[in-house]
């Protein structure tokens, strides 16, 4: 196929596989790739190889140093665990320690709906933050975000909302 000028002019010979197409975005420095649309029916078949259109959304701008501002995220699901593009493995329902860069990244699309965000008390300014080792996954104990001496007590609130959700 690569020697056929008609297939080259029709963008067939140089086409990516679906996997290769998404990988090309990653190699170009994009993150958070999502396949938004994939044609069920191929628009052409050549020598038993089907060609179809896919639409991919990707994001730029996650470069930078990793600083520990004592933030944590909780992956909400639906999967038992996920592995992000940087190799962070996150288990559903657990309080994960993340660097400020990852924390800010998860607060944006396409990640935001899948996480709960825990800011520290008190806030750690960027200029006071220490380097964070993103290569080792770890959980963040509530005492790290609230402080070792945190002993606040509050009045009990109604545990069910107006719609009887408990």
PLM ranges: what are they?
Residues 26-166:
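C-terminal lobe and adjacent flexible extensions of AdoMet/dcAdoMet transferase-like proteins
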Residues 17:
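Segments that shape or occlude catalytic/ligand-binding pockets
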């Amino acid at each position: 196929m690569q020697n056929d000028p008609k297939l080259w002019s029709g963008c067939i010979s140089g086409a990516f596989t679906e996997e290769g197409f998404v990988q090309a975005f990653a190699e170009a420095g994009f993150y958070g790739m999502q396949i938004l649309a994939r044609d069920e029916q191929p628009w052409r078949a050549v020598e038993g190889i089907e060609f179809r259109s896919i639409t991919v959304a990707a994001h730029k701008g996650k470069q930078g140093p990793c600083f520990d501002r004592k933030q944590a995220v909780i992956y909400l699901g639906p999967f038992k665990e996920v592995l992000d593009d940087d190799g962070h493995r996150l288990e559903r329902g657990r309080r994960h320690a993340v660097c400020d860069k990852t924390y800010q990244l998860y607060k944006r699309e396409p990640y935001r709906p899948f996480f709960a965000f825990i800011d520290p008390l008190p806030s750690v300014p960027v200029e006071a933050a220490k380097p964070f080792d993103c290569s080792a996954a770890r959980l963040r104990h509530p005492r790290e975000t609230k402080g070792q001496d945190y002993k606040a007590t509050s009045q009990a609130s109604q545990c069910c909302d107006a719609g009887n959700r408990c």
